[in-house]
Amino acid sequence: MSDMAERLALHEFTENAYLNYSMYVIMDRALPFIGDGLKPVQRRIVYAMSELGLNATAKFKKSARTVGDVLGKYHPHGDSACYEAMVLMAQPFSYRYPLVDGQGNWGAPDDPKSFAAMRYTESRLSKYAELLLSELGQGTADWVPNFDGTMQEPKMLPARLPNILLNGTTGIAVGMATDIPPHNLREVAKAAITLIEQPKTTLDQLLDIVQGPDYPTEAEIITPRAEIRKIYENGRGSVRMRAVWTKEDGAVVISALPHQVSGAKVLEQIAAQMRNKKLPMVDDLRDESDHENPTRLVIVPRSNRVDMEQVMNHLFATTDLEKSYRINLNMIGLDGRPAVKNLLEILTEWLAFRRDTVRRRLNYRLEKVLKRLHILEGLLVAFLNIDEVIEIIRSEDEPKPALMSRFGISETQAEAILELKLRHLAKLEEMKIRGEQDELEKERDQLQGILASERKMNTLLKKELQADADAYGDDRRSPLREREEAKAMSEHDMLPSEPVTIVLSQMGWVRSAKGHDIDAPGLNYKAGDSFKAAVKGKSNQPVVFIDTTGRSYAIDPITLPSARGQGEPLTGKLTLPPGATVEHMLMEGDDQKLLMASDAGYGFVCTFNDLVARNRAGKTLITLPENAHVMPPLVIEDEHDMLLAITQAGRMLMFPVDSLPQLSKGKGNKIINIPSAEAAKGDDGLAHLYVLPPQSTLTIHVGKRKIKLRPEELQKVVGERGRRGTLMRGLQRIDRIEIDSPHRVSHGDSEE
């Protein structure tokens, strides 16, 4: 091995190499500087364009020229990466305040990377870029050598507004990343002015001004204010954006999409659900976007009965119509170190940067003014002694020392006199020189006054911030509206909600008819079969069947055959126990309370949802004593309703329905006491059950007789649950009972 070779442990070399690479990526590639809000490549592009004279009023120039200058002079990396960074700064849908004004194909919201090659596009700086460049060259920036040491480039640009917040940025470094969202210029400028006026301003006071991020889209930010506050307090979090939609002629029109969301991709996502039959209520999709309406996506429902609010809620949960954006306010501070900062820290530190920039600008200008005043003093001497000055210049071999010695002027003043052309000497006028002197002395005093007074400096900072906010500011684009969390619909929710009537025959054949105006008994039945029951509901509600053993089953109406035919046997869809038949059928809302009972005198309260069993074999709902039967389920409208029980022997008992327990299944509690011996012999059992509103009147039909029981008469049969009841003569063979309630109409959705 050569003596010149350096021996180094491998682990030390790799550690140092990785650390050096990490620091390079963090400091020189991925993270923005808090002062101008730019990464190095962005800064170099903007500076190179300014050096090419491509300001907002210049003619457009080929983008390849700019990229070539950037790569050749400042940024020795790939041309495609450099051009892509330039494209992003030119896209109004990517940057809140674009830095580059592009001509040609610079991509589209649907496909941001569809931009043309740099040999085809042309560009120049936008008007907004003046905020970063206008004070350059006024002593405001530190300059560093470029990569090959042949020229200088600015270490940062003297931004007049907090561009770090206005345009934001994203980047992935080594071991860290940054995701800074864009904000509204007027809000940020106002917050900065407030912080100058009141240095002790709190974060909450700033958040009254800076409402939240402001993306280059009209989509809504739906994150709650409390969560947004946490983001700006901790410097980390996420916000959610949701598309904006309206109804037009029954269809949904989406007019704004979340940031960087492609309308074409959204339509593909919705179409995929339609192909997979997960959106049966949507009939058609259209993209009607054009130059006048950059975003116009149309979703057409199958009918005007479709709940489009529910459909959109589902699409928000399952497509990019709602999107989350990570926020990580990580940046390189004034100390040169990367750190995650909160909103108050960012604005405070940027104001320190801005204050230093303005101070440097004023000092630079003051130095220029003082130099000019010094020269004017010398020129004034020359004017007052014009003949002697001319004589010295004509006669002396070294006129500069002679002038300095004769008039007591400095070398700079003597050089200024000697550099004047004769025609200028002839035009020198004392009033003109003194006029310029007076103006510059006023400016000098003004500059020195501002530099010496913090109050005057603050006034200047506020004035400049307000002027820039007025010149470049605009209204907020992304409104903040708190919305409920979107939830995807289940298969059950996706079923169309249309009125249907389910018809059951005596032989157990079932069918579904559209609408509620159906003459169920008058339908066509198989030979030997006839009508048994009908129930009305919606097509997206399950229909529940209860068999003679107390088991319950549920079927979606959409799976049932049409009423145009004679239906299908339930045994093809359900697996009933041997010898069991379907006894009852009902459709209600999921939370509707029902009374389930057996003729053995037991019962309980449950909800309709407790009856739903999707499997073929169903589930045990009510436990029946030997030889007992299931009574028809009864709807409970109000917790104050009364339950009236009538036995075969004519005994009546009435008590509050809330005396019964609420169960999901079981035998229940005793409603009315029926002696087991009589029940076993069939001499007695529960014959009738009614849920009555208070103050109801009953008309009981026994043969040709009518027995009317008014509220005061019904009070005689009121007792505790489980009692024997009161024996009412002549009520052993009740044909039917009519209920007259002054408070509400009784349920009439089922026929049996």
UniProtKB/Swiss-Prot annotation:
The UniProt site entry described as Transition state stabilizer is assigned to R119
Tell me, in one coarse class, where this protein mainly resides.
Answer: membrane
Give the top-rank taxon of the lineage listed in the UniProt record for this protein.
Bacteria
Pfam families xrefs: DNA_gyraseA_C, DNA_topoisoIV
Q: Where is this region: Disordered?
A: 472-492
| Topological category with respect to the lipid bilayer | Peripheral membrane protein
Q: Name one GO biological process term.
A: DNA topological change
Q: Which UniProt keywords apply?
A: Cell membrane, DNA-binding, Isomerase, Membrane, Topoisomerase
Return the annotated site residues (Interaction with DNA): K39, H75, H77
Q: Where is the composition biased (Basic and acidic residues)?
A: 473-492
Q: Which SUPFAM superfamilies match?
A: GyrA/ParC C-terminal domain-like, Type II DNA topoisomerase
Q: What is annotated as the active site?
A: Y120 (o-(5'-phospho-dna)-tyrosine intermediate)
Molecular function terms in GO for this entry? ATP binding; DNA binding; DNA topoisomerase type II (double strand cut, ATP-hydrolyzing) activity
Enzyme Commission identifier(s):
5.6.2.2
> What sequence ranges are listed for the domain Topo IIA-type catalytic?
31-494
**Matches recorded under CDD domains:** TOP4c
One CC-aspect GO term? cytoplasm
The entry's localization annotation reads:
Cell membrane
Catalysed reactions listed for this entry: ATP-dependent breakage, passage and rejoining of double-stranded DNA
The subunit structure is:
Heterotetramer composed of ParC and ParE.
Function according to Swiss-Prot or TrEMBL: Topoisomerase IV is essential for chromosome segregation. It relaxes supercoiled DNA. Performs the decatenation events required during the replication of a circular DNA molecule.
Q: Which family does it belong to?
A: Belongs to the type II topoisomerase GyrA/ParC subunit family. ParC type 1 subfamily.
Provide the protein name: DNA topoisomerase 4 subunit A
Please report the organism this UniProt entry assigns to the protein.
Answer: Salmonella typhimurium (strain LT2 / SGSC1412 / ATCC 700720)
